[in-house]
């Protein structure tokens, strides 16, 4: 059975392919009487929309969302919320050459091995085009969090590294993230990164990146031992983003080099934490501190450099990908990371309420 859904109480199912007529999602479990309209969703989709700079794919999709069900007179009804975006700028002819050839680094060969058939147009179901609906679902999750927790909830992500060039954390400025096309929080890194990406594009190649996402203003108590840990679900959500190859929570792999007294987050009355190496989660349960996740995303597999591969019949070939592609998919993964964080937190908020109520 395929797995096209995630979440338990706030459950999101996505559907559609890159070059199909439309993509969409169904959100089940959203509480009734939340104020919701397309205007609450569209701005988040606009942040992810392709073709907004020379550093992302030049596929031009307006990504106009339509609410098909679950909302009446501007409020959620408690029934499934169905959202849809029409695809308008497909160029399927660009992919005719790979109908029988496997693109190295893509899911082509894996899909064929599993299903014996694949939609080769733009990657079909495995395309990052699907993530537009995750962003749409994340917008609904934000409305839920804002309504049930408060306006103080903030979920923000940023690009923290490209091709081994990383930001200076001491210059982190969230306002700067919205001022440049790379979602970079360090103004001094933007110029060198743009020069690097221009060089990569000119070479017909691609490059990897790192993204960090932070959620603030959430209550303590989200997550449950031992198989419903908040950090486990966050790691799974981030790992499910196209191209992600590694996920960290808090200081992640860096803690392997620390001593116990260095890694411990001292606690004072309040409670107040002196540091946040744990990323806001202990024992799988949120502590009320900022929740921090980080991931590494691989270079875009679609490149102009010929790479050895095989056909469906096992013959040796070289594949040079045509079409419109991102030189660094990490850039447009930033709003997707925010959306996945929002969906997981909305799900865990409802799960916590179901078990513990609101009175804690």
UniProtKB/Swiss-Prot annotation:
EC number(s) reported in the record? 4.2.3.5
GO cellular component terms, semicolon-separated: cytosol
Superkingdom of source: Bacteria
Question: Which EC class is this protein assigned?
Answer: lyase
Single GO biological process annotation from the record: aromatic amino acid family biosynthetic process
Alphabetized GO MF terms: chorismate synthase activity; FMN binding
Cofactor remark: Reduced FMN (FMNH(2)).
> Which residues of this UniProt protein bind NADP(+)?
48, 54
Positions contributing to FMN binding:
125-127, 242-243, 283, 298-302, 324
Query: Which prosthetic group or cofactor does it need?
Result: FMNH2
Against Pfam families, the record matches this protein to: Chorismate_synt
Q: Which UniProt keywords apply?
A: Amino-acid biosynthesis, Aromatic amino acid biosynthesis, FAD, Flavoprotein, FMN, Lyase, NADP
Complex and partners: Homotetramer.
- UniProt similarity note: Belongs to the chorismate synthase family.
According to its UniProt entry, the function of this protein is described as:
This reaction introduces a second double bond into the aromatic ring system.
The molecule here is called Chorismate synthase
